[in-house]
Amino acid sequence: MKIGFDAKRAFSNYTGLGNYARDTIRILSHYAPNNNYVLFTPNKNNNIRTSFIHGKENILVKTPETLINKFFTKFWRTKNIVNDLHKNDIHIYHGLSNELPIGIEKTSIKTVVTIHDLIFIRHPHLFNTIDRKIYYKKFKHACTVANKIIAVSKQTKKDIVKYFNISPNKITVAYQGCNQVFQSKIPELQKQLVIKKHKIPKDYLLYVGTIEERKNLLAFLKTIQQLPK
């Protein structure tokens, strides 16, 4: 079976969406090696985090072929990519980051889309009006035409049902995994060197992520204050 991926963020994003895309491709290609995986991306950027694809016989990377698609990559990814999916005999196409191309629902290609959150609806003040309208149109289209939806949390599933009127039977909750790089055992000496270098106190909390209002860090800190000493 040939499975296609919207792999743009696997090559260009170094945070949540990129990690999800890379891990999904890496894990599937390893544990389901009999399938062929085709990664569709506007640009094949040099990315050390995608080095796992090198030497993988069941992974192929495809970029826009025609001049117009190379120049208008957003249009290619939004619509014209459907032609390339046909040319490559794709059986299943997975939109890894909230989107599916227009017109794919008119083909025989089965589709899956992963929805990470609908925060632009739940907290609209964090986004400008134009972005909210674009996101709403893209996300709703993907959820409507997809054969299957993956939600990364139960809350996201509830939001999809509530805001897009999608049947809950169409949605599967699959929590994002953790790359083994985050599970590495660090020698005690190395820990102490880092603690000394950065003057870290005895009691501390490590947060890995961007500092933004939508990350809810303020509520986290307020909760800590209420914990018993």
Language model features with spans:
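Carbohydrate transferase catalytic cores enriched for Leloir-type hexosyltransferases
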Residues: 1-229
